[in-house]
């Protein structure tokens, strides 16, 4: 941080990827200003919801829909799910695209009955605040159990040695998928993969903790700084069922 320095800050805004609550708290402690998290996609030009200034702010939430925008959480049949249950976010409003250029099939899949299907899984609370659970395509199904990688990543980020974490599904001959976690450590941190595995094991349900943890120098990222899970280097002994 250079001149004029933190004293000039009033608010920080986060978007583009789900912000771990532990990181949000660390930012607020370091800079002494609130971090307001929002949500949107290129198809929603690009904001759909926000933790609005002057309203209640809920860490870990993407807030409530912006003006003239409607959001719902639906199941696979596009029926709205009960409050607190997980489903896919769908969005309707003047900010939603008309379609993908020269991609009619993709447009028909994403836009149904005027609602844009985001591919993001979330839940909504009694106050209408939305909470991202994970990307639909990142869901891990282990022996019939649904596991949301972000839940495990949040636990890893709470460990003082962890700088970056990404949880992915690995092929398994009997279970279909097994839970794996790639981790990058903070400078100077010393901890083993087994110790990290046991740390998570003590905080989540038995079927959720990553059986495989490996430590990398850094996790791959795209141009915007998001971790790119498909580019994560996986140990050779874990890549085949």
Model features per residue range: what roles?
Residues 1-85, 94, 108-111, 174, ...:
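Conserved adenylate-forming
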Residues 36, 213-216:
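General small-molecule cofactor/ligand-binding pocket signal
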Residues 234-241:
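Acidic/polar alpha-helix N-cap and adjacent early helical turns
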């Amino acid at each position: 941080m250079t001149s004029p320095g933190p004293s000039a800050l009033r608010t920080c805004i986060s978007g583009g990827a789900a912000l771990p609550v532990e990181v949000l708290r660390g930012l607020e402690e370091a800079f002494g200003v609130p971090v307001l998290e929002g949500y949107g996609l290129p198809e929603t030009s690009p904001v759909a919801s926000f933790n609005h200034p002057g309203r209640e702010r809920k860490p870990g939430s993407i807030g409530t829909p912006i003006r003239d925008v409607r959001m719902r959480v639906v199941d696979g049949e596009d029926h709205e799910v009960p409050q607190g249950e997980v489903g896919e976010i769908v969005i309707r409003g003047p900010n939603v695209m008309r379609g993908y250029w020269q991609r009619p099939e993709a447009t028909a899949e994403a836009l149904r009955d005027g609602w844009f299907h985001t591919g993001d899984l979330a839940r909504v609370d009694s106050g209408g605040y939305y909470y991202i659970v994970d990307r639909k395509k990142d869901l891990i199904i282990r022996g019939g159990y649904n596991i949301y990688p972000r839940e495990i990543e949040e636990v890893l980020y709470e460990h003082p040695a962890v700088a970056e974490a990404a949880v992915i599904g690995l092929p398994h001959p009997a279970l279909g998928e097994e839970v794996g976690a790639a981790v990058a450590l903070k400078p100077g941190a010393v901890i083993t993969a087994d110790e990290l595995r046991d740390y998570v094991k003590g905080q989540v349900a038995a079927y959720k903790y990553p059986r495989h943890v490996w430590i990398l120098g850094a996790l791959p990222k795209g141009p915007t700084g998001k971790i790119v899970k498909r580019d994560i280097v996986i140990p050779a002994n874990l890549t085949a069922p």
